[in-house]
Each structure stands twice: as structure tokens, then as C-alpha cells.
Amino acid sequence: MAENFGKVIQISGPAVDVQFSETTLPEIYTALRVVSEGFDVPTPINVVLEIQQHLGEGRVRCVAMEPTEGMVRGMKAIDMGGPISVPVGRGTLGRVMNVIGEPVDQLGPIMVEKRNPIHRQAPAFDEQATTAEMFETGIKVIDLIQPFLKGGKIGLFGGAGVGKTVVIQELINNVAKQHGGFSVFGGVGERTREGNDLWLEFTEAGVITPGDPSKSKAALVYGQMTEPPGARLRVALTALTVAEYFRDEEGTDTLLFIDNIFRFTQAGSEVSTLLGRMPSAVGYQPNLATEMGELQERITSTKRGSVTSVQAIYVPADDLTDPAPATTFAHLDATTVLSRALTEIGIYPAVDPLGSTSRILDPRIVGQEHYDVAQGVKGILQQYKDLQDIIAILGIDELSEDQKLTVSRARKIQRFLSQPFHVAEQFTGFPGRYVKIADTVRSFREILQGKHDEIPEQAFYMKGTIDEVHEAAEKMKANA
């Protein structure tokens, strides 16, 4: 096929207009590469654009995936023959790439046999797995209170420093060791410093081994705050495309992390304004629900494997009715809320069991026993929360015997919801624990039944199963 060329005729920041012949007009979402060949410019130009609109008379309006500084009218735009394509496969593990699939970790080219387009159809109805199945994470508080749906979408809410990254690292570690699966991290409009910190932490924790895909469990795809809005809008699709390959071609259960899904919406709003679309409510793009749906509907379980996504969600001005978070909520199967109040008393992971929810905490999916134990745990923690004002004003001695027992069990449950993580061993000094769901349900059932009322609450802190609590209690007795 002969190469198809166009010419740059207008540049408005990240929006670039290109003139083609009417007979060779490329399709919407086709990638173009603008080069400075034949132009005397200080820095050579090699910028990828994506066609967003056909303006008529052979003109197309594109959005740049890289900065357009130095680009001038008249430069050649090469039709790449299809949408942006990115490397997929095991060669991406342990590597950091950008929105167009180029490595940014200075470890040389990404060695893969295949590249896939970032724009793809969601799996058809007949390809999707129809059974609702729980995804075991090995983290007690998540598995018990807000179980993840295999192939589902989970919202992770939390401010700075409450442990979002550590929860993400542990999930990546557990999915690799227990499920033999892979993880893909999509940094959407995040701070460059945070991306660098995550890369270093993953390396130290052994989640990735730079330059050795066989020893790495995660691929990283970054589009930082400094990138043009086009890159921030499309980087989530790049990360999803990498994850889809592991689901469809390797048949694995894959984890996809998106941090932050709000910035995907924010970038879409910027692009929409650049393209001259009429804004809708609160200034967001009119196609907000469509853009979100196109991304979220591709995250699902098929008969071959699953992509389970954990999405960090920023809520502007803590307003949950804002169109950006409200549109995201419509797609979520579970919400995990990290609480600063729990970090202040040293409970890690700092997941708020009363603020977190899951669609599959249902006796028909997780079983009657799991459901009853989870509701019992939430009930006793709620009673403890209701009694805290009385305790603060009058003291614990003013409570009835039943209330004192409730407080005692609630404090044990609260401490037992803490858990040592494999990826945090060097900080906590506790060896990491992966707790199977059967052990989690059994342990909490026994606490609710009062079988461990005589054990001091200190013995429950940073333990895996109830058997470890017994061992700690025996040691405490022996040392007393």
C-alpha cells in the first residue's frame, strides 16, 4: 500500500489541522506522524496525532499525543494506516511505556512480537462470562466486607498518605503469587514524582525486575500531568489494551490499576473544548457518559480470562454528585474507602469497613455463612461507633455488661482487620500473610461467637489467621 501524506495547515496548542486529498482521507481515530523533514528547526519534530474530526474538503482535526512546540505549518503528516498501536505481551512486564507504546525507562526497545490498536470493541455478549465469581485478594478486610468481583470494577477512595499505593502493591504481589496472573498500572495524569516513586517501590519490593520480563509481574503505562490532554485521555486505553492481551491471549486473571480515573475525565473535557464542542453540566464534555462507557465496558470477564480493575477516584470538592465521579459510580461493582482515622491508630490496611461496599456481598454469590459473618462484623463495629460518644463523655465503666462485651469484641475485630503485607515487610517487621477466604470467615465467626473473649486485644494486631492470634496469646502468657 502506498504511503498517504497530508500537510499541517493549522496548530492551536494540542489541536492540529491537517490537509489531505479528498480521495485519501484517513478514518476517525487514525494515527498520523508529523515529521520536520525538509524544515530547518532547532529540534527535530516526530509527533503522533490522532484524528478526531473530519472538517470537510479534505481537512481533519487531530489531537496531539506529544507536545507540539516547534511544529510549523507545512510539515508532512504521515498516515500510519490505523489507530495508535502499542506493544502487548510478556515483553511489556517490568517496563514503563507512554501512551504510544514507546519505552520511557531508558532500558532499550520493548521486545514483543505483537502490537494491538488501543481502540477496540468491548467483548460481545456471547463472549462474556455470565457467572458472578468472587476474586480472592488474600486481604481479610477486602475479602470479608467488600469482596471484589472477578472481572469487576472497584473504586479506591483515599487521600494522600493513607496507603493506596501499598494496597495496590499487595494486590499486584498476591495476584502474581496466588493466581499466576499479571498486573498493569495505568498512571493517568498523575504527578511525575509519584510515578517515579511507584517504579522505585515496585523495584524494591520485587514486583518488577527492570529489564527482565520473566521475573516481573507488572507493566507500567504513564501519561503524567505534564503531557498534553490527548495523551492523558488515551493512556488509560493503552494500559487496558496491554491488560486485554493477557486476558484474551494468555487466559489469565489480570489486574488493571488506573490512577486517577478523574483525570481521564478531566483530559476529555480539555480535548472536547479544543475541538469546539458545546460543554454540558459543570463544563464537562457532552459525551462524558459515552467516553466513560467505552473504557469501562472493555473491562470485563470473558470465557478465557478476566480483567479486574481497581480505579483510584478523586472526588472534586468532596461532591459525589459532580458529573465526573457520578458517571464513574454507575460502573463500579465495589467501593473501597481508605480512612485517615484508621491510619492514626495504626490499623493497616486502613480500609473503612463501614464506608466500603460491594455489589456481590450477597448470600447467592459469596454464600450464606460469609454474608452472615460480614453483616455481623459490620453490625458490631457500628454499635461500637455509636457508643464512642458515651465512652468519651462518661467513660467505659458507665456502659452495661452487654455494651462492654460489644466494645471488647469490636476492638478485637478492628485490630484483627489489620494485616501484615508482603510488600511492607521492611517497614513493619512482620512477615506478610495471604489469608484464604475460608480462614477469614472462620476466624471472624469465632470472634463473633465469643470463643476468644478471654484473649487480650493486643494479640489480634497484625495477624493473619485466628491460629496466629492463639500463638501470640500463648507467648504473652509465657512472658507474663
UniProtKB/Swiss-Prot annotation:
GO terms for cellular component: plasma membrane; proton-transporting ATP synthase complex. PROSITE patterns: ATPASE_ALPHA_BETA. Its EC number is 7.1.2.2. Pfam families: ATP-synt_ab, ATP-synt_ab_N, ATP-synt_VA_C. The keyword Iron does not apply. The keyword Translocase applies. One of its GO terms (molecular function) is ATP hydrolysis activity. It is an enzyme of class 7 (translocase). It catalyses: ATP + H2O + 4 H(+)(in) = ADP + phosphate + 5 H(+)(out). InterPro entries: AAA+_ATPase, ATP-synt_VA_C, ATP_synth_F1_bsu, ATPase_a/bsu_AS, ATPase_alpha/beta_chains, ATPase_F1/V1/A1_a/bsu_N, ATPase_F1/V1/A1_a/bsu_N_sf, ATPase_F1/V1/A1_a/bsu_nucl-bd. Keywords: ATP synthesis, ATP-binding, Cell inner membrane, Cell membrane, CF(1), Hydrogen ion transport, Ion transport, Membrane, Nucleotide-binding, Translocase, Transport. It is a peripheral membrane protein. It comes from the Bacteria. SMART domains: AAA. It is found in: Cell inner membrane. NCBIfam families: atpD. F-type ATPases have 2 components, CF(1) - the catalytic core - and CF(0) - the membrane proton channel. CF(1) has five subunits: alpha(3), beta(3), gamma(1), delta(1), epsilon(1). CF(0) has three main subunits: a(1), b(2) and c(9-12). The alpha and beta chains form an alternating ring which encloses part of the gamma chain. CF(1) is attached to CF(0) by a central stalk formed by the gamma and epsilon chains, while a peripheral stalk is formed by the delta and b chains. Produces ATP from ADP in the presence of a proton gradient across the membrane. The catalytic sites are hosted primarily by the beta subunits. Belongs to the ATPase alpha/beta chains family. HAMAP family: ATP_synth_beta_bact (MF_01347). This is ATP synthase subunit beta. It comes from Koribacter versatilis (strain Ellin345).
